[in-house]
Amino acid sequence: MLSEIIRIADPPLHKHLKFLNAQECMFAFRPVVVLMSRELADAEIGLLWDMLIAGGDHEPTSRANGTLAGGGARLFLHVVAAALVSMRSQVMACKKNDDLMQLVARKLPARKFTAHELVRKAMDLMKTTKGLGEAIEVASRASIALEGL
C-alpha cells in the first residue's frame, strides 16, 4: 500500500523508485516495523502513537468469514509516506537501490520530524489518495473469497 500512496501522491518520485527497483518499498521495512521510533525524538514517539490510536489505526479489520485481519494502519502508512515525500530531493538524488537503503537507514533518523508535522502531512496525503484504502480492502476481500473456491 505504501507504494500505491507514493504513486498517487508523487508520480515522479514513484517513477524514480521504480528506476531504483525499489517500488515495493522494502527500504521502508524498518520504519514500519519499529513504528517510526528511530525516526522521531523520544518525546515525539508517544505523541505519534497516541495520534495513531486516536485515528483508529489499531482497530481490527475483519475478513469476509468474520475472522480478524489485523489493524488498518492507513494513517500510519501515510505517515511513513509523508516522511519519504519530505525527503524527496534526497531520494531523487539516489542513483541505485543501495543509496536509498543507506539514506533511509542513516539520514531518515537524523531528520528532525515532529509527530504533528508528519500526521498533518499524512492527513493531506490521505485526502490525495482518498478511496485507496477502500479499494485495497475490496481487493483483499475478493482475494479471500477466491481462496475459498
Features from the language model and the residues they span:
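Helix-rich, well-folded core regions that mediate interactions or catalysis
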Residues: 1-149
